[in-house]
C-alpha cells in the first residue's frame, strides 16, 4: 500500500513537472528571416508562405527592382538597409538606399512590419520612382 502510494506520488510529481515545462515553454517564434535578406509573408503578422529576397539581389537589380508576390502582406527586414515603403502611383515600393516616392513609413534594419499599409498592392523592391 505504501509502495503504491509512493509510485502514485512520483507519477503526480512527474506530471506536474512536465505540465510546468509545457506552460513555461516560449511561444513559437515568428518565421525566421536569414540575415541580409528581406522576407515577405502571405499573411499578416509574419504568417503564411515566406519569400526570401537577398539584399544582394536587390542591389544587382538596381532601379529595375525585384517584384515580390502580390500576396505579400507583411515583411521582416533582415538587411542592413533602412526600408521605406508607401504608395507610389499603382505600386508600393521599397528602395535602396531609402529613396521613395510618397513615403508613408519606414522600417529599420532588423525590424518586422506586421502588415503592409495597403494590402493587395504589388511590392517592388529597388524600383526608383523618383522623389
From Swiss-Prot:
<keyword id="KW-0646">Protease inhibitor</keyword>
<dbReference type="GO" id="GO:0030414">
    <property type="term" value="F:peptidase inhibitor activity"/>
</dbReference>
<dbReference type="Pfam" id="PF03995">
    <property type="entry name" value="Inhibitor_I36"/>
</dbReference>
<keyword id="KW-1015">Disulfide bond</keyword>
<keyword id="KW-0483">Metalloprotease inhibitor</keyword>
<dbReference type="InterPro" id="IPR011024">
    <property type="entry name" value="G_crystallin-like"/>
</dbReference>
<protein>
    <recommendedName>
        <fullName>Metalloproteinase inhibitor</fullName>
    </recommendedName>
</protein>
<comment type="function">
    <text>Inhibits microbial metallo-proteinases, such as thermolysin, but not serine, thiol, or carboxyl proteinases.</text>
</comment>
<keyword id="KW-0481">Metalloenzyme inhibitor</keyword>
<keyword id="KW-0732">Signal</keyword>
<feature type="signal peptide">
    <location>
        <begin position="1"/>
        <end position="29"/>
    </location>
</feature>
<dbReference type="InterPro" id="IPR015791">
    <property type="entry name" value="Antimic/Inh_G_crystallin-like"/>
</dbReference>
<feature type="disulfide bond">
    <location>
        <begin position="33"/>
        <end position="39"/>
    </location>
</feature>
<feature type="disulfide bond">
    <location>
        <begin position="93"/>
        <end position="98"/>
    </location>
</feature>
Amino acid at each position: 500500500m505504501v509502495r503504491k502510494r509512493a509510485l502514485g506520488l512520483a507519477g503526480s510529481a512527474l506530471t506536474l513537472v512536465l505540465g510546468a515545462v509545457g506552460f513555461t515553454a516560449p511561444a513559437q517564434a515568428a518565421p525566421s528571416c536569414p540575415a541580409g535578406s528581406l522576407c515577405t509573408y502571405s499573411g499578416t503578422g509574419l504568417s503564411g508562405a515566406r519569400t526570401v529576397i537577398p539584399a544582394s539581389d536587390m542591389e544587382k537589380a538596381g532601379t529595375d527592382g525585384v517584384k515580390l508576390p502580390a500576396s505579400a502582406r507583411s515583411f521582416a527586414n533582415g538587411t542592413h538597409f533602412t526600408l521605406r515603403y508607401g504608395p507610389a502611383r499603382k505600386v508600393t515600393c521599397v528602395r535602396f538606399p531609402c529613396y521613395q516616392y510618397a513615403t508613408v513609413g519606414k522600417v529599420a534594419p532588423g525590424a518586422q512590419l506586421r502588415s503592409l499599409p495597403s494590402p493587395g498592392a504589388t511590392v517592388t523592391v529597388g524600383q526608383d520612382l523618383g522623389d
